[in-house]
C-alpha cells in the first residue's frame, strides 16, 4: 500500500508538492515511531504496543478510502508511517518469542522481503483493475487485521 501512497494522493486531486510535503513529513514521523519503539523497548510483556499499533495502522488505511482531501490524507500518511515503524519491532519481538530454535527468525526476512516484492505487484494489479484505490485499501486493512489475529493466536498458543 505504501508504494502507491503518492498515487492515492494524486488521484484525490492533491498536487505533487502537497504529496511530496506529506511524504517528507511522514518520513520524519517514521523516524519518531522507530525512536518511540526503541525507547519503550520490548522488555514489558504487555500487549498494548501491538494492539495499539495494529489498531492505528488499520485506522490510517481506512482514512485513505474515498479520495481524501489534504488534511485527511496527511493524517493517514503520517499515522501510517509512524505506526508501522513503531509496531514492527514489537511484532518481530513476538515472533522471536515464539521461536525456540532460530529457524523462524531466520526466515522472517525472507517473508518480509517476499511481501515487499509481491505486495506492489498485487497492489498495482488491483489499481489497474478497479477505478479507485478503495479495493486496495480494503485489502490492506483486511491483511493487517489477519496479521493481528495470527500474531495474537500464535502468541496465545505459544504461552500454552
Q: Model-predicted segments: where are they?
A:
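Hydrophobic/small/kink-forming positions within alpha-helical transmembrane segments
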Residues: 28-32, 62, 82, 113, ...
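Extracytoplasmic gate region of multi-pass secondary transporters
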Residues: 1-24, 31
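Intracellular helix-loop hinge segments at the cytoplasmic ends of transmembrane helices
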Residues: 7, 81, 88-98, 102
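Helix-to-loop junctions at the C-terminal end of transmembrane segments
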Residues: 32-46, 127-128
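A late C-terminal transmembrane helix in Major Facilitator Superfamily
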Residues: 99-132, 140
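Transmembrane alpha-helical segments of major facilitator superfamily
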Residues: 20-30, 80, 108-112
Amino acid at each position: 500500500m505504501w508504494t502507491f501512497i503518492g498515487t492515492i494522493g494524486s488521484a484525490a486531486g492533491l498536487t505533487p508538492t502537497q504529496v511530496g510535503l506529506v511524504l517528507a513529513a511522514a518520513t520524519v514521523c517514521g523516524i519518531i515511531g522507530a525512536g518511540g519503539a526503541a525507547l519503550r523497548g520490548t522488555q514489558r510483556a504487555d500487549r498494548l504496543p501491538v494492539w495499539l499499533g495494529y489498531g492505528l495502522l488499520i485506522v490510517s488505511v481506512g482514512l485513505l478510502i474515498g479520495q481524501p482531501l489534504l488534511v485527511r490524507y496527511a493524517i493517514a500518511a503520517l499515522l501510517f508511517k509512524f505506526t508501522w515503524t513503531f509496531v514492527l519491532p514489537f511484532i518481530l519481538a513476538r515472533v522471536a518469542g515464539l521461536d525456540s530454535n532460530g529457524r523462524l527468525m531466520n526466515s522472517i526476512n525472507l517473508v518480509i522481503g517476499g511481501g515487499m516484492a509481491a505486495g506492489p505487484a498485487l497492489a498495482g494489479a488491483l489499481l489497474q483493475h478497479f477505478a479507485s484505490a478503495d479495493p486496495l485499501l480494503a485489502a490492506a486493512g483486511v491483511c493487517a487485521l489477519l496479521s493481528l489475529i495470527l500474531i495474537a493466536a500464535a502468541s496465545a498458543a505459544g504461552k500454552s
